[in-house]
């Protein structure tokens, strides 16, 4: 059985040092830096199912941000304004520290003028997610294609329509692509 912990590696004067930050006898994984680089967020299953935690770089001041019980939290990411985004039970959620998680409502708007069968696409089953640097858009992969949705409006656009499986989505630092 795997039991991952989180470590910090530092390089000073061509010498690398390692410091163990978490030591839970289970899974702690997927760390991401906070905006101030003085702490980090990560996923831990220490309370039964994976949830989002935050702690300082020395492992102190640990705080649990989400409290899901049925299923694990997956695909943790963060925007430059501190908005965290994650997958839970096939849906996409966002949360800011000290607030309750919000499910991202996703609906598809089309420009089609012909009478065609319109498929309703929901975020259920999304396999990867990424938050734009300003926190206003969320990209996700659903059934192998990339979609982008607004966190402020009910607009979702399908970006790709290929036979290939898309993967490893992310926003450019300027948020334009």
What is each stretch, according to the model?
Residues 1-7, 15, 20-29, 34, ...:
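A flexible loop/linker signature enriched in serine peptidases of the S9 family
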């Amino acid at each position: 059985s795997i039991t991952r912990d989180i470590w910090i590696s530092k390089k000073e004067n061509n010498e690398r040092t390692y410091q163990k930050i978490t030591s839970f006898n289970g899974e702690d994984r997927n760390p991401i830096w906070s905006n101030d680089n003085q702490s980090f967020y990560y996923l831990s299953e220490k309370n039964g199912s994976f949830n989002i935690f935050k702690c300082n770089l020395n492992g102190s001041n640990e705080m649990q941000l989400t409290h899901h019980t049925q299923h694990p939290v997956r695909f943790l990411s963060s925007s430059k304004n501190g908005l965290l985004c994650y997958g839970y039970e096939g849906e996409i959620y966002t949360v800011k520290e000290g607030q309750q998680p919000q499910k991202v409502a996703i609906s598809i708007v089309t420009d089609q003028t012909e009478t065609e069968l319109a498929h309703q696409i929901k975020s259920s089953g999304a396999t990867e997610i990424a938050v734009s640097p300003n926190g206003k858009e969320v990209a996700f992969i659903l059934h192998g294609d990339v979609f982008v949705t607004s966190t402020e409006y009910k607009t979702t656009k399908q970006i790709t329509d290929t036979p290939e499986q898309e993967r490893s989505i992310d926003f450019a630092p300027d948020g334009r692509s």
